[in-house]
Amino acid sequence: MQNKERIRYYHSYTDDFAQARDQNYTVPEDYKWVREDFFSRLLSVLIYSIAILFGIFYCSFGLHVKIKGRKKLKAMRKTGGFLYANHTQPIGDVLNPAFCAFPIRIYTVVSPANLSIPVIGRILPYLGALPTASTMSGMRRFTEAIEHRLSQKKCIVIYPEAHLWEYCAFIRTFPETSFRFPKAYKKPSYCMTTTYQKRRFGKKPRITIYVDGPFEADSELSGKAAAVKLRDDIYNCMCERAENSTYHYIEYRKTEEHKA
């Protein structure tokens, strides 16, 4: 019998199951997406290195992660690029892309609400968090930060599903908005699909991550059409990989299925 504590009901794929302290938080006008003064760079190296060391143990022994296809990202060392992923782990989604892309440094597009989390919110910028902006001037500096990191041949991580659904074993549909970047900056795209399998011992599943790509934006299509096609290519690939999920540790059901 399914454990009711592990059934979650949703109205739409934009429902939030993980709430930050302030979901309406916006980045201030003086926010710095790129911090390259000596102190900030030193702090970033230290915090990122500690996160990697912590992640080795947490992902290997806590989440039981196995990565397949990691070598496909090797080519990104010469170009930089984008890595799209499904959003299903609160801590793992911070660490797993770093392992997949290593030794390439990652910078992750995040909701500004994450910056409102006590303690962690102050650390996130030094881990490479790039919060989205709500103003025109903020969006300009946000995209300039992405362009700057790509010029350094870094990896930009994007979770197009946008909302964290812990242990979700299927791919939620997502818009093409974030898929305009690869064509605009002429960079390759990859995808990272997290899947779940039952372990012989223990309640929580084993995680298998599949890395696929590169996917190239169609140069003959307009910006929107190219973004739609790239989105479809990556979405279909992720859905195919998600079929390797054989265990639903948390089951997600639409509200119509909920019976009092």
Q: Where do the protein language model's features map onto the residues?
A:
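Soluble or luminal CAZymes and related metallo-dependent hydrolases
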Residues: 46, 50, 137-138, 226, ...
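A conditional alpha-helix N-cap/helix-loop micro-motif detector
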Residues: 63, 135-140, 171-172
